[in-house]
């Protein structure tokens, strides 16, 4: 049995025999792998899970599936971490784009994910030759329920994501369909589909590609330098500072609906809106008036006044990391806090006011919510 990689380092002493016999101790992880473990735990485990098995928030995929690791090149994983998956909860973590990770930190995460995994396979190069129309029929019948459509996300990886399709090879996609992602719900389709049908599906998935929009780059007007942890606050923290307090009705004593928040803004009620995502996400799209308070840096909350003003946090999960921010605020004694229930993309879909980077592509509709 393979132990989850994050837990393996912690339990190695417990695996030693109890007979008193001498046993050669396992070498400690290299500094690079240890750095990757710590970096992963801080930034990635929230959604992908402590053991990288995925599906903790927003259906973040497993990063430990053998069929993923044996087919995903370092370059592909690096692009996924650095550029993210725009329109989803997977942020761009590269410091160049306003995220918290420099290139060595990204490489350390990759080294950590590779620990105990299979060797990288040499997959065929070049495009897959398939029939797009036939592939759509197969996709609609077998894949769309989990993977969605270009305009609607669902419970699994959104295969129409432009950055995914710009960085994934046809061979990577073909291997995923053929071999699945054990032990996740993505089953192997080899046998259920013929090789020609798999080629057709890959051709159809590839046909959904559109050129990804250029990411919003930090500038002197937004951040001090590319690796700055937070955009400096040029606007007010408190919106409508002379307004009355809103009268929210919370679900489960935690969640406030986007409709209530929009009405409070329309009524000029006093409140604070905190974006719990990475600054790179804030740069690309945020609710008008929101400040950047990334979930991994509680220092970002220090300037928020603790005077009874309502503080509303949001994210794209739709409310996992924003829940962490609200939990921290409540721990500090803030009396009026809530999570914006449906998240940023439902807010955008409702055509409520946002600040978006020039050229930002419309996000696919988020999947149905589950508390």
Where are these regions (language model features)?
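N-terminal export/targeting leaders of redox proteins
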Residues: 1-32, 104-110, 369-371
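Electrostatic cytochrome c docking/interface patches
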Residues: 21-38, 114-138, 249-252
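Inter-heme linker and motif-flanking segments adjacent to c-type heme-binding CXXCH motifs
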Residues: 25-29, 53-55, 100, 115-130, ...
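Sequence/structural segment immediately N-terminal to covalent heme-attachment motifs in c-type
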Residues: 29-50, 77-79, 129-150, 173-179
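Extracytoplasmic electron-transfer domains, predominantly the class I c-type cytochrome c fold
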Residues: 62-113, 154, 160-210
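Alpha-helical scaffolding within the catalytic cores
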Residues: 76, 172, 295-302
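Flexible, polar/low-complexity N-terminal or interdomain linker segments that lie immediately upstream
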Residues: 206-273, 279-281, 357-371
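Catalytic cysteine-centered active loop of the rhodanese-like fold, especially the PTP/DSP P-loop
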Residues: 298-347
């Amino acid at each position: 049995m393979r132990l989850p990689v994050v837990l393996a380092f912690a339990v190695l002493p417990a695996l030693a025999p109890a007979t008193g016999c001498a046993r050669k101790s396992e070498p400690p992880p290299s500094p690079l792998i240890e750095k990757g473990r710590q970096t992963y735990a801080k930034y990635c485990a929230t959604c992908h899970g402590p053991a990288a098995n995925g599906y903790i928030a927003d259906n973040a995929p497993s990063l430990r599936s053998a069929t993923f690791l044996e087919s995903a090149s370092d370059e592909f994983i690096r692009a996924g971490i650095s550029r993210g998956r725009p329109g989803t909860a997977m942020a761009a973590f590269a410091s160049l784009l306003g995220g918290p990770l420099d290139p060595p930190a990204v490489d350390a995460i990759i080294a950590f994910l590779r620990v105990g995994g299979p060797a990288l396979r040499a997959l065929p190069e070049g495009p897959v030759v398939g029939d797009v129309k036939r592939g759509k029929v197969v996709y609609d019948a077998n894949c769309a329920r989990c993977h969605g459509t270009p305009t609607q996300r669902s419970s699994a990886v959104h295969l129409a994501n432009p950055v995914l399709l710009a960085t994934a090879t046809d061979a990577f996609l073909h291997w995923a369909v053929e071999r699945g992602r054990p032990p996740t719900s993505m089953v192997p389709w080899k046998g259920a589909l013929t090789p020609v049908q798999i080629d057709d599906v890959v051709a159809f998935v590839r046909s959904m590609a559109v050129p990804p929009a250029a990411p919003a780059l930090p500038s002197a007007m937004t951040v001090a330098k590319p690796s700055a942890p937070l955009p400096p606050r040029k606007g007010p923290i408190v919106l409508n500072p002379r307004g009355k307090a809103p009268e929210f009705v919370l679900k489960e004593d935690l969640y406030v609906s986007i409709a209530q928040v929009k009405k409070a803004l329309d009524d000029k009620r006093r409140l604070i809106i905190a974006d719990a995502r990475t600054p790179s996400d804030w740069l690309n799209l945020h609710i008008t008036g929101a400040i950047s308070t990334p979930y991994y840096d509680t220092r970002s909350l220090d300037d928020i006044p603790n005077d009874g003003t309502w503080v509303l946090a949001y994210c794209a999960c739709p409310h996992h990391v924003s829940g962490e921010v609200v939990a921290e605020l409540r721990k500090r004694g803030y009396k009026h806090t809530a999570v914006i229930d449906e998240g940023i993309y439902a807010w955008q879909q409702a055509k409520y006011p946002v600040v978006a980077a020039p050229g930002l592509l419309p996000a696919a509709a988020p999947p149905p919510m589950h508390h």
